[in-house]
């Protein structure tokens, strides 16, 4: 392979130092103990209702959640929390945190994102504390998961674009994991769904980086209703 034939490596990737990469991979790994395995974001009801019953329908459901639902909204909140933390603008950070918490569509989804946000902050501070992080956390009543990731990432100097891609990959992987247990799907089919969603994750991240808080909105009514109906689902494996 000649130099001209080699895949292009962006400056952002080459400039990411090894400690930052190590932390990013650790924080957004399935092994990082935020309890994501216990939540399905309403997918359990979607399977119960027959909206999701195979790899293709799971891919379609998650694609819409990424582009028009909580995936995009949470991505924007992450970016703005990261930006406020970088600037040391605690008032702005508090506003973003409050808006993000208010935007959650159901009680169980509120539990899901606040519990994971709290766990993420506590564990990251215990193992990798950073100047200014304690003060930022103390000024916010509660941080939902994407806001917590944005704040911690900014405190450690990790670029928002890389942090955002890693976050969306982690969230999407967790959704697929829930779907694979519920439908069920095999490991190969699950990875095919993840591969098919790669361009969707990338496009969502690109949109979110340049989006304002006024651009936030959701059109995933079926997914929001699923998260509400899950609260009274008779038999269930997940907490949301």
From Swiss-Prot:
Record Gene3D superfamilies: Urease accessory protein UreF
Location in the cell: Cytoplasm
GO annotations of cellular component type: cytoplasm
Highest taxon of the lineage: Bacteria
GO molecular function: nickel cation binding
Main location: cytoplasm
Alphabetically ordered keywords of this record: Chaperone, Cytoplasm, Nickel insertion
Family of the protein in this entry: Belongs to the UreF family.
Subunit: UreD, UreF and UreG form a complex that acts as a GTP-hydrolysis-dependent molecular chaperone, activating the urease apoprotein by helping to assemble the nickel containing metallocenter of UreC. The UreE protein probably delivers the nickel.
UniProt cross-references to HAMAP family, sorted A to Z: UreF
Function in brief: Required for maturation of urease via the functional incorporation of the urease nickel metallocenter.
Name of the featured protein: Urease accessory protein UreF
């Amino acid at each position: 392979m000649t130099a001209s034939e080699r895949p292009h490596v962006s400056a952002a990737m080459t400039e990411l130092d090894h400690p930052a990469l190590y932390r990013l991979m650790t924080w957004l790994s399935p092994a990082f103990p935020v309890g994501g395995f216990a939540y399905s974001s309403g997918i359990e009801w979607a399977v119960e209702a027959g909206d999701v019953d195979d790899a293709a329908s799971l891919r379609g459901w998650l694609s819409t959640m990424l582009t028009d639902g909580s995936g995009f909204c949470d991505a924007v909140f992450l970016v703005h929390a990261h930006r406020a933390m970088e600037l040391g603008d605690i008032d702005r950070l508090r506003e973003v945190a409050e808006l993000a918490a208010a935007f959650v569509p159901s009680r169980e989804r509120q539990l899901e994102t606040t519990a994971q946000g709290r766990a993420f902050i506590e564990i990251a501070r215990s193992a990798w504390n950073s100047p200014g992080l304690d003060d930022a956390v103390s000024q916010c009543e509660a941080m939902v998961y994407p806001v917590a990731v944005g704040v911690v990432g900014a405190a450690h100097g990790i670029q928002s674009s890389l942090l955002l891609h890693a976050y969306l990959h982690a969230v999407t992987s967790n959704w697929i994991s829930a779907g694979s247990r519920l439908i069920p799907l095999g490991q190969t089919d699950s990875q095919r769904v993840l591969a098919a969603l790669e361009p969707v994750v990338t496009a969502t991240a690109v949109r979110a980086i340049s989006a304002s808080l006024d651009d936030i909105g959701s059109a995933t009514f079926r997914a929001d209703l699923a998260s509400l109906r899950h609260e009274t689902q008779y038999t269930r494996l997940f907490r949301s």
